[in-house]
Amino acid sequence: MGSEALAYALRLLARKGYSRAVLRAKLAARFGEAEAEAALGRLEAMGYLDDRAYARAFVETRARRYGPRKLRALLLARGVPEEVVEEVLPEARVEEALAVLRRYRHREDKARAVRFLEGRGFPLGVALEAWRLAQEEGEGYK
């Protein structure tokens, strides 16, 4: 019972991490709801499926490019429960926004740079503060 679903799930997880919701959808589409739930239960019992670990790894690999709002939206879109998202997300830090801004090629244009940071999930206040610090550093910002 469910050994095919379990084997399929293990093959998927061997390639990359999945949230419980995404893996459940993949398994349910192929094997049905009952087998999917049974396989997910076994995976959780064996320690191969953990939304907190998935969310932490997801944030670690993308935190340099995206701010907390963007990361939150991406995690929620992948079916990670909101309480897990709130637990693993870091606070928006001005230093991170400034580091992202330094890599942006249109950083001399304030409006574009602030929009760029907002698009990466940084709140407006953090984006503006990063812009102000960049001006103080005198790195060619206008």
Curated annotation (Swiss-Prot):
GO cellular component terms listed in the entry, alphabetical order: cytoplasm
InterPro entries listed in its UniProt record: RecX_HTH_1st, RecX_HTH_2nd, Regulatory_RecX, WH-like_DNA-bd_sf
Statement: the UniProt record of this protein carries the keyword Cytoplasm: yes
Keyword NAD tagged: no
Top-rank taxon, per record: Bacteria
Swiss-Prot/TrEMBL keywords: Cytoplasm
GO biological process entries: regulation of DNA repair
Cell compartments where the protein resides: Cytoplasm
Family: Belongs to the RecX family.
Role description: Modulates RecA activity.
HAMAP family: RecX (MF_01114)
Official protein name in the record: Regulatory protein RecX
Lineage: Bacteria, Thermotogati, Deinococcota, Deinococci, Thermales
